[in-house]
């Protein structure tokens, strides 16, 4: 079984969010199952220089983008025994930032076409091309409408994974012809048309052989108008070819016993060292140094989706409780300002860090007692999985992957790995936080839920097996 992942980012080469983590870890677990897996990515300016230096040039060619022919360089790097191919074009990818450019539609039209064009030149005919999010969704459209009648491409199948339905890649109608040389017969409900525009993600949904998303609950939710972002009709029609597969994390990377960024390593059998991580974090962030104060961590984008409205609404009430709050992330100005002002008002109890720092993120996962994710919606979520691994008890709203991975702790049965609330409601969130911190002073009870969290399987092993079964079903 030969599978090629086509994506817009993957750690350690490029990462803006959870997609990069997934593409940087899942292929290695598939390889352990015997899959011949490779990955193809854009060669961004921001790829670390030491990795660029290890890339080997294969060849250069031209790729049609509508009526134009654009330069395409092909490079390869073998990383942990997996071939990573890179599509090089200085005009499209030698700039700051992976996304957010006015010509993103053209940039990823070029990348999608390049993926298909270069396959015969790299001696790689995959059984399946696994595409991810809107940036590579149109590979499925191109394959089905323009390539599949050619012998080389005849039996290639595509799987398309939705990581976040909110971001769809919607561009003017003209791009179908101008960038893809596509036929107007595909500009309809069963094709790529979306309110008079071209929707790349819709192309992925309608032309892929199978669709997955990143948790079973999210797969159900997106068939409903509230979560469907205007594509619920397509997803409902395709529900027999739609499956939710819960994301995992690379538990060899996220490992509190070996993580070099922690103040002190620890395990579920040695929780005393976890306290030292909290004390070290308090010192680093100039918070009151006190092991007895419950600390709540948030590593998040500061946007509405992540439930920041609920937190902002309850900040003053939360400060009436004996807690500390540590926030790391960037996002909308209004939320940044709310947390900036809160940290000024409560300097020993709130730490606001409006940037991203991988070391500090790991120290928050390792040092906090609780990890708050009150999301409005959450396709899967990786933060709660990392928190579980580090024994930082999640407090989450029951949506998407949060509902699938976090079970409310029952003091009687002693089962459960976190605390949850159902409704998107600030008071429900506050009451759940109060219930969680009520348990904190009783170390025997609290350490039980911590150990439950740390013993939760959060790696890729089971999900990789599910993907392999899915690939095989496509023949």
UniProtKB/Swiss-Prot annotation:
EC number(s) given by UniProt: 2.4.1.21
Positions of disulphide bridges: none
Q: Which GO terms describe its biological process?
A: glycogen biosynthetic process
UniProt keyword terms in alphabetical order: Glycogen biosynthesis, Glycosyltransferase, Transferase
Residue spans crossing the bilayer: none
Catalysed reactions listed for this entry: [(1->4)-alpha-D-glucosyl](n) + ADP-alpha-D-glucose = [(1->4)-alpha-D-glucosyl](n+1) + ADP + H(+)
- Which pathway does the UniProt entry assign to this protein? Glycan biosynthesis; glycogen biosynthesis
GO molecular-function annotation terms? alpha-1,4-glucan glucosyltransferase (ADP-glucose donor) activity; alpha-1,4-glucan glucosyltransferase (UDP-glucose donor) activity
Which HAMAP family does the UniProt record give?
Glycogen_synth
**Protein name according to UniProt:** Glycogen synthase
């Amino acid at each position: 079984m030969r599978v090629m992942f086509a994506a817009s980012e993957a750690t350690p080469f490029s990462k803006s969010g959870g997609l990069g983590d997934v593409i940087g870890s899942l292929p290695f677990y598939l390889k352990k199952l015997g899959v011949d897996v490779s990955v193809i990515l854009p060669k961004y300016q921001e790829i670390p220089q030491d990795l660029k230096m290890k890339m080997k040039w294969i060849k250069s060619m031209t790729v049609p983008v509508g009526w134009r022919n654009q330069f395409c360089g092909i490079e390869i790097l073998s990383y942990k025994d997996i071939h990573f191919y890179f599509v090089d074009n200085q005009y499209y990818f030698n700039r700051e930032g992976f996304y957010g450019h006015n010509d993103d539609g053209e940039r990823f039209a070029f990348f999608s076409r390049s993926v298909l064009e270069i396959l015969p030149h790299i001696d790689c005919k995959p059984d399946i091309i696994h595409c991810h999010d809107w940036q590579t969704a149109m590979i499925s459209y191109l394959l089905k409408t323009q390539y599949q009648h050619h012998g080389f491409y005849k039996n290639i199948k595509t799987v398309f994974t939705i990581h976040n339905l909110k971001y769809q890649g919607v561009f003017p109608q003209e791009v179908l012809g101008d960038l893809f040389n596509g036929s107007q017969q595909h500009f309809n409900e069963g094709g790529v048309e979306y309110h008079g525009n071209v929707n790349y993600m819709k192309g992925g949904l309608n032309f892929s052989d199978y669709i997955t998303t990143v948790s079973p609950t999210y797969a159900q939710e997106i068939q409903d108008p509230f979560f469907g972002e205007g594509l619920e009709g397509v997803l409902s029609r395709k529900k027999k070819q739609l499956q939710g597969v819960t994301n995992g994390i690379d538990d060899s990377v996220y490992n509190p016993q070996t993580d070099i960024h922690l103040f002190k390593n620890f395990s579920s059998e040695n929780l005393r060292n976890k306290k030292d991580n909290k004390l070290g974090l308090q010192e680093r962030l100039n918070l009151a140094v006190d092991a007895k104060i419950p600390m709540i961590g948030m590593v998040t984008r500061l946007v509405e989706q992540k439930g920041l409205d609920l937190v902002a609404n309850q900040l003053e009430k939360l400060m009436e409780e004996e807690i500390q709050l540590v926030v790391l992330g960037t996002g909308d100005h209004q939320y940044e300002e709310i947390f900036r002002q809160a940290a000024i008002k409560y300097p020993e109890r709130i730490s606001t860090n409006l940037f991203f720092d991988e070391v500090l993120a790991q120290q928050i996962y390792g040092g906090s007692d609780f990890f708050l994710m009150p999301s409005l919606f959450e396709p899967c979520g990786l933060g709660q999985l990392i928190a579980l691994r580090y024994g930082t008890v999640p407090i989450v709203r029951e949506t998407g992957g949060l509902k699938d991975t976090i079970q409310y702790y029952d003091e009687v049965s002693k089962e459960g790995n976190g605390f949850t609330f159902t409704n998107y409601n600030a008071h429900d969130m506050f009451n759940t936080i109060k219930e969680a911190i009520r348990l904190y002073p009783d170390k025997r009870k609290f350490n039980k839920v911590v150990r439950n969290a740390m013993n939760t399987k959060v790696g890729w092993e089971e999900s990789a097996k599910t993907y392999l079964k899915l690939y095989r079903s496509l023949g």
